[in-house]
From Swiss-Prot:
Consists of three domains, a large central CORE domain and two small peripheral domains, NMPbind and LID, which undergo movements during catalysis. The LID domain closes over the site of phosphoryl transfer upon ATP binding. Assembling and dissambling the active center during each catalytic cycle provides an effective means to prevent ATP hydrolysis. GO terms for biological process: AMP salvage; nucleoside diphosphate metabolic process; nucleoside monophosphate metabolic process. Residues 30-59 are annotated as: NMP. This is Adenylate kinase.
Amino acid sequence: MILVFLGPPGAGKGTQAKRLAKEKGFVHISTGDILREAVQKGTPLGKKAKEYMERGELVPDDLIIALIEEVFPKHGNVIFDGFPRTVKQAEALDEMLEKKGLKVDHVLLFEVPDEVVIERLSGRRINPETGEVYHVKYNPPPPGVKVIQREDDKPEVIKKRLEVYREQTAPLIEYYKKKGILRIIDASKPVEEVYRQVLEVIGDGN
């Protein structure tokens, strides 16, 4: 089964994807992670991607697809998280899957009001040494632990990220709606409740 997780930053896509990976054996493909890993390892594709990133440019679609092909499992269930972001990427992904005799089964759109996203993200704090993520309201850091707020998590930056997300993703939502595979998840609910909705969509995950 192939799933695509769509939704604004702070919708909890990563949390749900990690849980499905752990409990149902899905392979979680996060393009952010595979890009960082390829760049760190200095693979040929990673070196190419790094050139674009250093210039502050978007990594081209064909390069991202090539990176995905490298980590795509021979068989099993897969979640794409943070990809595709555009219709062009969705078409490229469909083409890649078709060659393997596969297709996207469900696209889960994690819907959450802006004010919830802003509260979730602007409260996030990170321990720069361990990468551990905390939240001032929901999961405060233990006393004495030094934490920082990422630039990305400042309210004015979050608003901009939400605007960009909307512009980019609206056509993509239409694309998957037309295919009849778009499923809406109410991501403003507590984590457990969101997970229950995800399981309802995918059945037992086979």
